[in-house]
């Protein structure tokens, strides 16, 4: 029986949607048990005097009745409910909150914009991999939060009174997706961002992370259209032009954009375009979590790990009883190989980190069965929650693990969008060779292998004199590997030193 003392819930009464996250604490991390989201569009119920309409209140209360049933099983001290921009603004917020608290049976805290920004940053820091120095952007329904920080520590926190619902009502109320409406929406957003831009740029960032429905929608569009996962200004401009071509909000059709997200997509896109231009952002990645995760981790008082991906990999190794010595052996070989060919194959630090992760969990499929272990590994990685890894990075890991041995599925390597297909293919080749050379599972059996690569993807494996004759089983595996790689036009040549 699941102990209720291990359960935690976080509820966010946002301007566009109400969200509930229910988790269980497991070995210093969290396991998601439920995510419930309902579009309430509370901000659309505000009039010119900031009075919240009774209809909007009813939509909110109806949603909270759904949430309240799940909360009955969780200790009150382990539930946190916060309200954001619209309920900060509404002059009759107390009327809504009084009934809402009766429905939920627990207090609701209306948090300031700065506190919202801090919680968002905290959620990102606990769930998102990559460099420590970051800029976090969260476009909500009624406000937009911008935060810079390093590691667990937020440095500058800003909350701006603009959101995808308020910008929809202000600039797209006629449902016209013309150039003029977009320009007005963008210009107004740029004027909001401009005063704080110098302070944000002064702190600087190594990575920009987006933690909102707008960014999630962009990610879904890019995956559907086979683009890589990084959001750039040129991609945003392309999507803006596509929206303008559609003409009307009711006729907005972009491959990968769901009907649920379509209504507030143009307004959110306008705000994001303004932020990119005012701050000079080169690219943005999707965050692993935000406000609700910040609330949960705040209740758990768990420290922010320096490397979230390493924590995730360690948890997988423990959970699936992986041979960590063998994983490290394969990883070190792969790192050595990638170092030898990094100049010719242009393998940067990001590529090497993802290859390292794949090596450390490459045997996870054995926990299901030896037969079809690579397919089992890919299935597990596709469907497990992997904090610190983006959806595209998860897909790449699954693809590499599925192609770690036997025949090579070239289309699968082209379908992932974390890295260019050619780069993913090169990582796959290195992983396969590292697994073969480490197959005896002992350090003293690893040969001094040298790799030589060229730009035409010809790869030469140079072995010590007489090694192939002395190691017939691995020699046979390498010969078979040469055939498999050559079959997909990856020339692999085996040589012995003279």
Swiss-Prot record:
Coiled-coil region(s): none
GO molecular function terms attached to this record: exopolyphosphatase activity; guanosine-5'-triphosphate,3'-diphosphate diphosphatase activity
EC number(s) from the headed UniProt entry: 3.6.1.40
UniProt keyword list: Hydrolase
Annotated catalysed reactions: guanosine 3'-diphosphate 5'-triphosphate + H2O = guanosine 3',5'-bis(diphosphate) + phosphate + H(+)
Highest taxon in the source lineage: Bacteria
Pathway assigned in UniProt: Purine metabolism; ppGpp biosynthesis; ppGpp from GTP: step 2/2
Enzyme class: hydrolase
InterPro entries in the cross-refs: ATPase_NBD, Exopolyphosphatase, GppA/Ppx_hydrolase, Guo-5TP_3DP_PyrP, Ppx_GppA_C, Ppx_GppA_N, PyroPPase_GppA_Ppx
HAMAP family (alphabetical): GppA
Family: Belongs to the GppA/Ppx family. GppA subfamily.
Role: Catalyzes the conversion of pppGpp to ppGpp. Guanosine pentaphosphate (pppGpp) is a cytoplasmic signaling molecule which together with ppGpp controls the 'stringent response', an adaptive process that allows bacteria to respond to amino acid starvation, resulting in the coordinated regulation of numerous cellular activities.
Name listed for the protein in its UniProt record: Guanosine-5'-triphosphate,3'-diphosphate pyrophosphatase
Annotated source species: Serratia proteamaculans (strain 568)
Gene name as annotated: gppA
């Amino acid at each position: 029986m699941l102990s209720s003392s291990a359960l935690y819930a976080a509820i966010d009464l946002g301007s566009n949607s109400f969200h509930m996250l229910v988790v269980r604490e497991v070995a210093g991390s969290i396991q998601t048990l439920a995510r419930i989201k309902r579009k309430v569009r509370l901000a659309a119920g505000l009039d010119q005097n900031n009075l919240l309409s009774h209809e909007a209140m009813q939509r909110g209360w109806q949603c909270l009745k759904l949430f309240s049933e799940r909360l009955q099983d969780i200790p009150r001290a382990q539930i946190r409910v916060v309200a954001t921009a619209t309920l900060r603004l509404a002059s009759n917020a107390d009327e809504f909150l009084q009934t809402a608290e009766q429905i939920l049976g627990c207090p609701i805290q209306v948090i300031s914009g700065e506190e919202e920004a801090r919680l968002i940053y905290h959620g990102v820091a606990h769930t998102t991999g990559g460099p420590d120095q970051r800029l976090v952007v969260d476009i909500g329904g009624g406000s937009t939060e911008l935060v810079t920080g390093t590691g667990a520590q937020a440095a500058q926190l800003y909350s701006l009174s603009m959101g995808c619902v308020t910008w929809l009502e202000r600039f797209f109320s006629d449902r016209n997706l013309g150039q003029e409406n977009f320009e007005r929406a963008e210009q107004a957003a740029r004027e909001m961002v401009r005063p704080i831009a110098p302070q944000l740029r002064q702190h600087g960032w190594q990575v920009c992370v987006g933690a909102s429905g707008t960014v999630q929608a962009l990610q879904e569009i890019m995956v559907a259209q086979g683009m890589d996962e990084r959001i750039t200004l040129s991609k945003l401009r392309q999507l803006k032009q596509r929206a303008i071509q559609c003409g009307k909000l009711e006729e907005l059709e972009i491959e990968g954009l769901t009907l649920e997200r379509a209504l507030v997509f143009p307004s959110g896109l306008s705000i994001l375009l303004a932020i990119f231009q005012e701050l000079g952002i080169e690219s943005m990645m999707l965050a692993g979590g935000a406000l609700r995760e910040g609330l949960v981790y705040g209740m758990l008082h768990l420290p922010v790990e320096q490397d979230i991906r390493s924590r995730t990999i360690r948890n997988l190794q423990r959970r699936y009883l992986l041979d960590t010595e063998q994983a490290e052996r394969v990883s070190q070989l792969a790192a050595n190989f990638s170092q030898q060919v990094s100049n010719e194959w242009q393998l940067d630090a990001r590529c090497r980190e993802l290859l390292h992760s794949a090596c450390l969990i490459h045997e996870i499929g054995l926990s299901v069965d030896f037969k079809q272990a690579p397919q089992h590994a890919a299935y597990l990685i596709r469907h497990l929650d992997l904090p610190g890894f983006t959806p595209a990075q998860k897909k790449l890991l699954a693809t590499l693990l599925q192609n770690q041995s036997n025949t090579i599925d070239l289309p699968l390597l082209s379908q992932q969008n974390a890295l260019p297909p050619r780069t993913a293919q090169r990582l796959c080749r290195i992983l396969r060779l590292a697994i073969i050379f480490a197959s005896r599972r002992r350090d003293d059996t690893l040969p001094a292998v040298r790799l030589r690569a060229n730009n035409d993807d010809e790869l030469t494996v140079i072995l010590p004199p007489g090694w192939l004759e002395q190691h017939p089983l691995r020699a046979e595996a390498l010969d078979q590997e040469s055939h498999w790689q050559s079959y997909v036009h990856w020339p692999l040549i085996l040589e012995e030193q003279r």
